[in-house]
């Protein structure tokens, strides 16, 4: 593999060097994602553990009152604090892994940009802006082409965006309406996040296929980035943006509403109604209160 500071002799050697540098990137990403998945599963287990202990603690307080200290209260409190600290440590571990993946991409991208700049300085590669300016005179307006892609006139929106499994039917109310609005917003992100690669021959784009790729590269990247920046809503226990498979809680008053599969230990869409751990705990408390009132 070439040295990091070595200047490429020509464009082909720069391409070969970049290909060699990123050869192991996929396997490195797989390893990082596997580590994050393990941390996610452990975190979910710890969270369920301290929620169960917290429920037991509340039950003891209700039975004996807050002034009378139960012998089990100390050990339960210690367990809750221990599991909560463990959850915090796991979240920190996941942040470090995510930053590692970001660093790997940034490092390779910076090196590719530096090689391109050095080739331009040596006169071995024509500056991209100059090449596009020369070809613009004999082609259609790029702005109109990009607008056509953005409006869906040159290609249809891809359906490979974020997948949001439909929640099973539940009682009508504010919770259901709120989840439906989130589903519609998710679908709009899917349509805006990716555009089709199939461009109609009659779309009025320049004849040179190389020019086509260069002309739309930066604008499409900015457009796609814009679609992702719109969805800054935080979901789930982990309070992160939406990604991958997500499931909606059927609890009408759920404060999170959407959950990542890995955070709730799911691998496939649940059958029937599904409630998050906190809503399940709330439902259990409601049933317990009803029984006490009947007694």
Swiss-Prot record:
CDD domains xref list: ING_ING3_Yng2p (cd16858), PHD_ING (cd15505)
Region (Disordered): 151-208
Binding site for Zn(2+) 1: 236, 238, 260, 263
Top-rank lineage group of the source organism: Eukaryota
InterPro entries: ING_fam (IPR028651), ING_N_histone-binding (IPR024610), Zinc_finger_PHD-type_CS (IPR019786), Znf_FYVE_PHD (IPR011011), Znf_PHD (IPR001965), Znf_PHD-finger (IPR019787), Znf_RING/FYVE/PHD (IPR013083)
Main localization of the protein described in the UniProt heading: nucleus
Entry's Gene Ontology molecular function annotations: methylated histone binding; zinc ion binding
GO biological process: chromatin organization; DNA repair; meiotic cell cycle; regulation of DNA-templated transcription
Biased composition (Basic residues): 175-190
Compartments (UniProt record): Nucleus
UniProt binding sites for Zn(2+) 2: 249, 254, 276, 279
PROSITE patterns reported in the protein's UniProt record: ZF_PHD_1, ZF_PHD_2
Keyword Phosphoprotein: no
PANTHER family referenced in this protein's UniProt entry, alphabetically: CHROMATIN MODIFICATION-RELATED PROTEIN YNG2, INHIBITOR OF GROWTH PROTEIN
Subunit structure: Interacts with H3K4me3 and to a lesser extent with H3K4me2. Component of the NuA4 histone acetyltransferase complex.
Family: Belongs to the ING family.
Protein name per the record: Chromatin modification-related protein YNG2
Source species taxonomy: Eukaryota, Fungi, Dikarya, Ascomycota, Saccharomycotina
